């Protein structure tokens, strides 16, 4: 019987806002606890870290900043893909999470990124782009350029 070992913690639709900072902090701490209990070193946010695409309050930005610092100090690398709630301009690669893209062990996905989960598994992560906009072409380009037939994708 094989033992299953978690490789990463995947999170989506966190939707942090000025109105739910305590809940965000509690959920983040729970995620860090899970990472600690299972020896997980990679946290991957697949989109919608933020609730509002129009603006972020300073308290919301600081809560996310503190959460990111707490995670990276615990030895956890964070990858963030921008969701539709994370971008003012839906076709731009830039979103609110790019404020933290230069932090150590924080990786913010521009269009797409590939994470090697194990020797035979690659996880493809794409930031949000509108379905009636550039999404389909970006996806086709990624598949054509990056799909690796020698591993599970």
Model-based region annotation:
Residues 2-7, 14-115:
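Core catalytic region of metal-dependent phosphoesterases/phosphodiesterases
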Residues 38, 119-153:
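His/acidic metal-ligating clusters that form di-metal
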Residues 7-9, 122:
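A fold-wide structural signal in alpha/beta-hydrolase
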């Amino acid at each position: 019987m094989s033992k299953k070992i978690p490789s990463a913690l995947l999170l989506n639709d966190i939707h942090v806002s000025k109105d739910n900072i305590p809940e965000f902090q509690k959920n983040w701490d729970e995620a860090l606890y899970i990472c600690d209990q299972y020896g997980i070193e990679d946290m991957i946010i697949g989109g919608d870290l933020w609730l509002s695409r129009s603006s972020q309050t300073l308290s919301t930005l600081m809560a996310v900043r503190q959460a990111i610092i707490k995670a990276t100090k615990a030895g956890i690398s964070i990858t963030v893909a921008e969701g539709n709630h994370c971008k003012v301009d839906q076709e731009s690669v830039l979103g609110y999470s790019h404020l933290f893209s230069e932090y150590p062990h924080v990786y913010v996905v521009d269009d797409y990124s590939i994470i090697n989960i194990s020797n035979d598994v690659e996880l493809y992560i794409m930031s949000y782009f509108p379905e009636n906009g550039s999404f389909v072409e970006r996806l086709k380009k990624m598949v054509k350029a990056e799909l690796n037939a020698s591993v599970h994708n």
